[in-house]
Amino acid sequence: MQSINQYVWIIPLLPCLTAVILGLGLISTKNATKSQRLGSAILSIGALLVTMLLSITVLWEQVISDSAYRQLVSWIKVDNLFLEIGCLVDPLSAIMLVLVTTVGVLVMIYTHGYMSHDQGYVRFFAYLSLFTASMLGLVLSPNLVQVYAFWELVGMCSYLLVGFWFTRPSAAYACQKAFITNRVGDFGLLLGILALYWLTGSLEFDIVASRAHQLLVENSANTVLLTVCCVLLFLGPIAKSAQFPLHVWLPDAMEGPTPISALIHAATMVAAGVYLVARLLPLFQEVPLVMDIVAWTGGITAVLGATVALAQKDLKKGLAYSTMSQLGYMILALGVGSYQAGLFHLITHAYSKALLFLGSGSVIHGIEPVVGYNPNQSQNMTYMGGLRSYMPITGVTFLIGTLSLCGVPPFACFWSKDEILADAWHKLPVLGLLAWLTAGLTAFYMFRMYFITFEGTFRGSSLISNKSSKQTLSVNKMDSVFALSNQTKDNTSLKASKHLDPHESSNAMTIPLIVLTIPTILIGFIGAPLPNGLTGSSLLSHWLYLDNTEIVELSTNGWTEFAITALPSVSIGILGAFIAWIVYGPHVDRLKNNPVSIDPSAEGWTGILLNSIYNWSLRRAYIDEIYDQTFVWATRSSANALAWFDQWTIDGIVNVGGLFTLLGGEGTRYTESGRTSAYIFVLGIGLVFVMIAAVLFNFFHL
């Protein structure tokens, strides 16, 4: 029986062909009929379902064989330049294949319900299929050249999907911001690839690290140059995985449809940066300074994302900053050498965050008939509350995702996050402390989102009613959701409202939510400690490991030691959730002058401190404002100066030359009298001037 690995190239090909077919259909048909829309969904979901089954087969063969497979084809061979393309199948790529396809299938099913009334329904499925093909091609790439090609395709798909509703100015701005910010990282990645090839003469993942090690041992390579090369390579993951300081594009990318937020900006594309760091980890470990840079970048990003998420009012943007923080956890783990923990958290977080994003989409879809289709209202948690009674499936599944992300046992993210904390404490205690504090912040802001959205009373109807009667409650000027609750607590009865009630989403949207709860609950057990008597610490550690690298592992003496190790992370998570319940629980209507809000009457150092933290979080740590006042302002000023120079200098010279030519032509036109005698007279005058010039040149010996 032939190995399935020989046909692994079919995996990215199927969704690619689907995208081509749908694209040709869009070109040939202006307005898709109902049957064509349904056909595009069936084709996209069916192709990706087959791809998912193939990916699961590849993963199973990797598990039982425990051997990598590589298939290469010569692409370019010119003198000393020899490049190949092909497929690389190992435990890392096999896991990513299953991750992308399983989440992708559920997102496409969800999309059928979420985008059912959108005019761009077929176009959306075409973009989804193209992105899936690009992502699958990226994880199967055996070298950096092929990675870069698919890396750019993934970025292009993100641009198209973030700006899917391009007639909306905010969406058009968001896709440009995402594209330009990622170009900074991609340029660094390209320079790093070129420098690495110049140093090692190869771009194959399994060769560059060994050659770099050999060059360092033989003192044939400059350590500084190799460090710069690795840092340039790391710029690509910094931008793609929304790490500080190139993270600013991710929250704005929430302008795209919610299924995209779940697939691209939570589970797959943003994880591509983590994947590339994992691939390059043997190379990075040759330079300890680079590992420290990676670790500190992840640690700072984790804390920054968590603090900024504390006061966000937009549900999707709050989840975006949460994603940024969790990606920081993964980068931190890889930076301290914990290869398994970083990738383990990538897996658990992908399913949990996909569940949360799809749940947020269900919430938005359910309240839009009540509050309107403006995202400033339908995504604003201020307009929500009490939705668990109207949307029970969405509420329960969102709570499961929240429990997982907060690290509550036995949900998936508990196992991976706890392993990261333990390894960080062991290698860099300062970063371990930051990661531990981030765990508490994560529990606080996630339960804050849950309580504001699903508990209490629904506030949307009363707000819309007050707006329609010109008694507008300005959300932008509200100090917090508490002030909003205090002002609307006497007018939140849905029965008296003339508006529709929030409603649960269709089966096409709720079934993926229910299915995603299964891995959110169970998949963490693949990394759970094994009972005494078995070697190793988990099932995952027997299979997903990195050769020739220092992996931080703690001794495993059973569940007792594990429970003691996990106690600090669970404790601070419970503390964060408890504080969120006190501040944002169902009883918030009874609270007055809550110090967490921006209360003008707040006095003392406590009020000043809390208000400063609130402003820091609400205004995104002022980073976007700083960038606008520096890089954006400088770029626009330079562009305006160049435009002025082009208009008045470059164009001015050309225009003046044209003006003189015009005047000369007009003047010459009047000498055209048609008389031969006049022409002879002018010719004679010219000859006289020529003779005078010749005499002068001869006399003065010029």
UniProtKB/Swiss-Prot annotation:
**Pfam families hit by this protein:** Proton_antipo_C (PF01010), Proton_antipo_M (PF00361), Proton_antipo_N (PF00662)
Its localization reads:
Plastid, Chloroplast thylakoid membrane
Q: What class of enzyme is it?
A: translocase
Q: How does it sit in the membrane?
A: Multi-pass membrane protein
Q: Where are the transmembrane segments?
A: 7-27, 40-60, 91-111, 124-144, 147-167, 189-209, 224-244, 258-278, 289-309, 327-347, 354-374, 395-415, 427-447, 511-531, 562-582, 680-700
UniProt GO cellular component terms: chloroplast thylakoid membrane
Provide the E.C. number(s) assigned to this enzyme. Answer: 7.1.1.-
Q: Which InterPro entries match?
A: NADH_UbQ_OxRdtase_chlpt_su5_C, NADHpl_OxRdtase_5_subgr, ND/Mrp_TM, NU5C-like, Proton_antipo_N
Any Gene Ontology biological process: electron transport coupled proton transport
Quaternary structure, from the entry: NDH is composed of at least 16 different subunits, 5 of which are encoded in the nucleus.
The family database entries (NCBIfam families) matched by this protein are listed as:
NDH_I_L, PRK06590.1
Q: What is this protein called?
A: NAD(P)H-quinone oxidoreductase subunit 5, chloroplastic
In its UniProt entry, the species of origin is given as: Zygnema circumcarinatum (Green alga)
Starting at the broadest rank, the lineage of the source organism is: Eukaryota, Viridiplantae, Streptophyta, Zygnematophyceae, Zygnematophycidae
